[in-house]
Amino acid sequence: MSSLVRLKFNAIKLVIDFGISENIAYLISIFLPIVLLLVISVLGVLVTVWLERKISAAVQQRIGPEYAGSLGIMQAIVDGVKLLIKEDIIPAQGDRWLFSIGPVLVVTPVILSYLVVPFGKNIILSDIRLGIFFWIVISSITPLGLLIAGYASNNKYSLLGGLRAAAQSISYEIPLTLCVLSISLLSNTLSTSDIVEQQCKYGILSWNIWRQPVGFITFFIASLAECERLPFDLPEAEEELVAGYQTEYSGIKFGIFYVASYLNLLVSSLFAVVLYLGGWNFPIPTTLIFFISMYKVSLPLDSSNLLLELIIPIIHISITLAKTYLFIFFAILARWTLPRIRIDQLLDLGWKFLLPMAVGNLLLTASFQLTLFEFS
């Protein structure tokens, strides 16, 4: 029994011990991971926003937020509360229903993507065998939400921003998918957990970044474009389109777009870690034999096993998040150091450079796998 299944079983048993019926306890066990996922996602966004403000301040030789909490850590929460209490304005000539459903279609696929992200060994909400395929399919819904948001606003800037967002997402989703398929072909699996497991044998030397360097570079650039980060933030270029498809949005709906942007950056970084940087695996190959024997000297067997069950998941999650925020650091650094490119340059980069690179990388990976199959 995995640690996650055991934790769920113990939680149900604990709720039943408090006098709650089994049916209600089972419902709680179903919805609790969903609530936990939402809370963790929001916390991840708050940390990412704070990091971006501090890093951008350092790049521009400023101090950044410092008064709202220690080191300005509460500034993102204050801004979020401010957005929640602002008036939600709907354009008089716009489509009210589509205007409201646009942000939902943008943020929902991003949140659902976290279901198949392994934060540690057996620490995953839904370990389906088609995890990579699920992420690719669910992320393809986001451009539809952006296009609907731009169309429903009945504003020329919003419509142009929505069209740009859809064109950009389609252009860069294809090379991104081909890079993911190369990793899947190399690992002979579509499961995110299995992909990480295959990168643990020799430590950092087993990571897929060494076997797929071209794929990693292509994935990094395409993921930045998918997240609409500078230098690829053409759909909301202030000098050209005011705020793009977000122009007519305010209050909580604008906040949903804002949160979705950072959630997308976070989930893209997590998948980069899972696919290329070994996931929860430590860079140096280690074994737990010495760790277990050290604690067995002074602790009973049950106590040492219980301690390991508590410590190992924490270590796995910490390693995954450390790699993720390292990836986010470079994404933030790119935003504040590179100039915005033109829309024609954006599409040329996607179709004329990244797509051929991704196709060539996939063909080389397939040839390599066929050669190994012939000699095995």
Swiss-Prot record:
Chain segments annotated as transmembrane: 27-47, 65-85, 97-117, 130-150, 166-186, 251-271, 272-292, 310-330, 353-373
Predominant place of localization: plastid
Keywords: Chloroplast, Membrane, NAD, NADP, Plastid, Plastoquinone, Quinone, Thylakoid, Translocase, Transmembrane, Transmembrane helix
Reactions this protein catalyses: a plastoquinone + NADH + (n+1) H(+)(in) = a plastoquinol + NAD(+) + n H(+)(out); a plastoquinone + NADPH + (n+1) H(+)(in) = a plastoquinol + NADP(+) + n H(+)(out)
Major enzyme class: translocase
Gene Ontology, cellular component aspect: chloroplast thylakoid membrane
Listed EC numbers: 7.1.1.-
Membrane topology according to the record: Multi-pass membrane protein
Subcellular location: Plastid, Chloroplast thylakoid membrane
MF (Gene Ontology): NADH dehydrogenase activity; oxidoreductase activity, acting on NAD(P)H, quinone or similar compound as acceptor; quinone binding
PANTHER family: NADH DEHYDROGENASE SUBUNIT 1, NADH-UBIQUINONE OXIDOREDUCTASE CHAIN 1
Purpose of the protein: NDH shuttles electrons from NAD(P)H:plastoquinone, via FMN and iron-sulfur (Fe-S) centers, to quinones in the photosynthetic chain and possibly in a chloroplast respiratory chain. The immediate electron acceptor for the enzyme in this species is believed to be plastoquinone. Couples the redox reaction to proton translocation, and thus conserves the redox energy in a proton gradient.
Record text on subunit structure and interactions: NDH is composed of at least 16 different subunits, 5 of which are encoded in the nucleus.
Family: Belongs to the complex I subunit 1 family.
Protein name per Swiss-Prot or TrEMBL: NAD(P)H-quinone oxidoreductase subunit 1, chloroplastic
